């Protein structure tokens, strides 16, 4: 698969394939289909090439023919159950082609989104797809676009519309509801004229319960793509609007209309969307962008569980970040995310309030406190957390938004890095063996207590030497309660 393939390269590949199949049974029967044709027509870069062959078993036969005639790079991989095959082109080894026969589908089991498939016509293949804009075919031999469902007109008019009757489309496969949300959000971010066809939107609402049979992994996959689009807020709003959020992350529904305190100008859901919007708009240079966006979406998920109102009628959410971290784990495990992903998002949510008391210009921050955060985060995670904190700060009411805080944290951090007093990669120069030797104690809680004391000394002075630390440890009185 090629990411961001230029139109010029795409046409070179199409012409290459055209010359190969000229005079064979595949001539006039082989089409590029789906997103590549849509993006070609919309003058966008193309991400992958999917091919359909309008012949029985055409996909596998075409792939095998390519291999037998020396046109593939590496081996062809076939999936006979689904009639599909995958291979890389010899002339363009970085390009992966997925090919399949044109198919028609029957959904006989209402509790499954896996249809029975068999060979079908080009029109039947188009009608089995979800959206008209994804149901376009480019004939490789003639270079003509075949449009069975009005997709070209829908692109011109910026319309997201299903290929046939919405109720049938979504009854057959509820995942199409989430795909529709994703495509709308993606294109609406680029051009606000994009909209969902009225009947298509009604069908999404009417058949939203079909999401109940979709596997959590597929839901998570669509959620990831929504979060990583240019306007994830559009997708999240639409999920709530059509009732789909209760099948994706139902806990988020509890934020809608949740009254907040004077520090906020929106309800908890509006605030969450503002934070997500700011995170999505910010340039990101790390590897954990999805984790940060997920943390933005879930950072206040604990608020409904800890809400309290004092005797003056003021609303409080004490400890919501701690409650939220526990709920984050429940949500992400349910959606089958990896342990590493869960731990990253949990950490960000649990610590997003960490700097609130430092003040707008960090006037209440101590160097040792900043170093402790650096040490506990590590370099990459530190700046991921600051991204979330900055978005959260700036989404508060104007008088409480701490607009300069993260800028000042970065300024102090840069100073520490310059004079080698930061603690991103700090390693304590003593260990448990050193402590046991100098104190004459055995392994246990006392050793841990001494090492924690040593870390406190290091937070104050990261250049402290092993000799100095051991001198302090030798004179350190271990509390009796810790023995």
Predicted features, each with a name:
Residues 1-483:
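Catalytic cores of the polymerase beta-like nucleotidyltransferase superfamily
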